[in-house]
Amino acid sequence: SEVILGKDKKIQEVELEKLLQSSNETVSLLVLNQLLEVNKNSKQKSISFIDQLLNTKKFSKKNIKFLKIKKSLLVFDTATEVEMLNLIDLKSKDSSFKKMSFEIMYDFYISKKQNLKANDLKRLIDEN
């Protein structure tokens, strides 16, 4: 990893993209974080990397939720409510990310000036 990070940005990105397809879940997630950092000015590329991982179907349920939350933060400004609800799991009772999911949707509703929905979520957040 350190060898890759010391190289030219384009070469670095190509080599990281190869590693992204690793069969090792941990390696893929660590590489994703590096790719997101390298491409922090390109939301589309970052979303594409997350989609690649989501489409491989090689991750645990917990990591799939984690990837979807990452994606929801990247698409936050342009997403529709349906897109956000498809990414954020508000129904799961045992989610490790339940409170965070509620808070992201709360912020989404506030940003879209949907105050009634935001207030409903705020009540649920405060109850938990």
Where are these regions (language model features)?
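Soluble extracytoplasmic domains of inner/organellar membrane proteins
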Residues: 49-128
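Extracytoplasmic/periplasmic/luminal assembly and interaction segments
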Residues: 4-59
